[in-house]
Amino acid sequence: MSKIRVAVIGAGGKMGTRTSRNLAAMPEKYELYCVEAAPKAAESVMARGLALYSAEQALAAAQVVIFAVPDTLIKKLSAIYVPMLQPGTGFLILDPAAAVARELSLREDCTFGVAHPCHPSFLKDQDTPEARADRFGGEGGHQDTVMSKIQGDDAVFALMQQTAKDMYRADNAFVMTSEQIAFLEPTLVELLGATCLYAMAETVDKAMEKGIPKEAAVSFLCGHIYNLTSNFLGYLEGRPPVSDACKVAIGLGNKMVLRDDWKRIWEDEVLAQVIHTMLHPDAEDAIRVELPDNPAIPIR
């Protein structure tokens, strides 16, 4: 069986490093062409023992292209790289925002898709110390990936699916539309999930102000998150009901913590506004937001 020829554009960035490292670990299956323009990032690629190629060399050879560049640069950079593709190439971006916003350059003779990692879940059987220590995925932790075919050939997309599963070390590749992936991220895991989790982390700070040791607050919070998440999502056998007092507390939290109309985040026009603001935060019609600034909590 011949090897799959894969080009990774941005191979020295965060996602480019993770994906190229995993594909490079399967030399019997993949012929890898790493492209990196930033000097320091290029040095990191070579330090891992991988060869660097020009974009022209890589795209002339590649069957599948992994476009590991920042979301905010996809519009600009895809306009440069997509015209260089060979007919029949599969082109994968790693986030749906630019596709949903129609900022990704396309070609009729190529196949385009999205592949985004789910990250290792505490509901999966993370059965080794390495798996349990892997927070991002691809380094021992069991995770899945979500994918969409924006346009193109089914056979090429099947090749892209296999490549995505290998580069993320994913157990499953769940295929859906790009819009559905966008409702997963940003809507589900960032607009709601990350916001709530950020508030929980800030609440640990408040617990410490009350004299509660951080270790106790974190253990108490994370244990309850595991228990309640498992229960509410149907992964706790028998789905035992929470206490009446907890039900009252949830009702109070809905009034004191969440906006009454928070489920509007699942409306199409809200998603469009959110994606536009995330890709173009300085645009005149972007939603004005106050960024979180707690120095104890890292924000990329």
Question: How does the language model describe each region?
Answer:
Residues 51-56, 175:
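Short acidic-hydrophobic, aromatic-tinged amphipathic segments that line or gate anion-handling sites
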Residues 212-300:
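NAD(P)-dependent Rossmann-like dehydrogenase/reductase catalytic/cofactor-binding core
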Residues 56-106:
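Rossmann-fold NAD(P) dinucleotide-binding segment
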Residues 185-194:
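A short glycine-threonine-serine/GTX helix/turn-capping micro-motif
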Residues 194-208, 227-233:
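C-terminal alpha-helical interaction appendages
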Residues 94-185:
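Rossmann-fold dinucleotide-binding core
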Residues 1-49:
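NAD(P)+-binding Rossmann beta1-loop-alpha1 motif at the extreme N-terminus of oxidoreductases
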